[in-house]
Amino acid sequence: MTEQKQIDPITLTVIWNTMLSIADELGTTLRHTAFSEGVREGDDFSTALFNSDALMVAQGNFSPGHLGAMPTCVKHALNYFPADLLQPGDSILLNDSFMGSGHFPDTFQIMPVFIETRLVGFVACSAHQVDMGGAAPGSQKVHGVTESFQEGLRLLPVRLVRGGNIEEDIMRIILGNVRMPEKVRGDLLAQHTANLTAAERLRELFRDYGTDTVEAAYELILNRSEQAMREALSKVPAGLYSFEDYLDDYGPGTEPIKMAVDITFNGKGDVE
């Protein structure tokens, strides 16, 4: 890490655990305010915190299925809305599978966090919506579907909330294309509310410890995580490892989909 500021181990541990607690509170808020059973009872959602460079620094202890895609979704959102165009209270919404969302029912919301005018990070959450339109209720029909346009409403990154105010025009477009608009609206607003809670907690952390200290902790967390992963990979004997498996077919008369991967380990913690 670039030694901008030294952090003692106790302070680092407190900051790190606070970030994890914020990510967990984000999810708890989402669960308690959601309208749909899938989110309230099925825990089909994920939460995370990101630094100002959109690198994940903390995860909530919820569904891991969305977390692998979340960094990609955040980066795509920022390609559409660069940091210098964002303002406090904004929220970016997307569900595009080509940008990382698993399928159209999975909506991601990303909120920038500012200390005065300085961007200090992002909070983000995903939630599986009960319906996003398409050929069948639930927006997961496979039989007879030949293209993504039949699957449901595809949302490229849009600013659902601008400066703390819901963009009702965008909300109406979404709700006009789903089968259960009350639950979808409720869950979208629950995601926004949960992000608001997490954003305030993150601002409190920065106020308590100072911007330089928390940003230095960000970097230490990332470096230590990388070091731990490289140490684990270095224990794998050098060589080429191959694996293949099959996904389910995608409808009547179709074959299972083969997935194959080759990974080369050099015995020093690097992979190809």
Residue ranges of each PLM-predicted region?
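Accessory "access/gating" subregions that flank catalytic or transport cores
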Residues: 200-272
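Regulatory sensory and allosteric helical modules in signal-transduction proteins
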Residues: 52-59, 65, 71-96
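Short, small/polar residue-rich loop motifs at catalytic or cofactor-binding pockets
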Residues: 41-44, 105-107
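Short, basic/aromatic recognition patches
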Residues: 18-42, 78, 82, 94-100
